[in-house]
Amino acid sequence: MRVQRPPTLLLVFSLSLLVTAFSKPLYVPEHCQNYSGCMLRACIKTAQADTAGLYTNFRIDVPSAESTGTQSVSVDRESTSTHDGPTEHVTSVNLFDVGYSVN
């Protein structure tokens, strides 16, 4: 006669999903560890938005100056700049080329 055991694997899996749903995120940035509740969630979302372009091919939509639509801009670290118009050009000046006096 076979003895039926409770479905332990299913029970463990469902309990782990339940615990994960109500727990803190796995990684909390160091500067967010003193917060709780809404402040913790806001701090984590800010940290995710600040680092999104560092590790992924992240694109954001910004308002376009030429039209009423938006323009998609890549904020990936490895992306090239897409400046269409003239940009401000600043020439570097060596400190030895500038005359100054010490009083």
Swiss-Prot record:
Compositional bias per record (Polar residues), positions renumbered to this chain: 65-74
Q: Which UniProt keywords apply?
A: Host endoplasmic reticulum, Signal
Q: Where this protein primarily resides, as one coarse class? A: host cell
Question: Where does this protein reside within or beyond the cell?
Answer: Host endoplasmic reticulum
Query: Which parts of the sequence are annotated with region: Disordered?
Result: 65-89
Indicate the secretion signal residues. Answer: 1-23
How is this protein named in the record?
A: Non-structural protein ORF3
User: Where are stretches of biased composition, namely Basic and acidic residues?
Assistant: 75-87
UniProt GO cellular component terms: host cell endoplasmic reticulum
